Amino acid sequence: MTDDRLTDPVAEQVLDGNALAGMLAATFGTEMTTVPGQCAHCGTVSMIGELRAYVRAPGAVLRCPTCDGIILRVVETTEATYVDARGAVHLRFVRR
C-alpha cells in the first residue's frame, strides 16, 4: 500500500476545514468549525472542521470526508463573500 500523498500531487494541498475557521467566522459571525452538516451526496454528518478543505482555487471548497462530494464553496471578492452550500442537506446551528 502506498501513501497517497506521495503519488497524488493534490493530496498534499488538502487541509481540514479548521483551516477556514477565520474566513467562516467572519462570514457567518460565529465559530463554524464545530457546526455539523449533512452531506447531500451520501448523507454523512460531519463537523465543518472535519471536512476536506481545498484552498488553492479562487476561493475555498469544502468536501465530504466520506464521498468527496462538494459541500460548501466560499469565494471572497473585494465587494462581497459568496457562499454556495447546495452540497449540504443542512447545517445545524445550536442556540445558546
Predicted regions and their residues:
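Short, charged, intrinsically disordered terminal tails
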Residues: D4-P9, T78, A85-R96
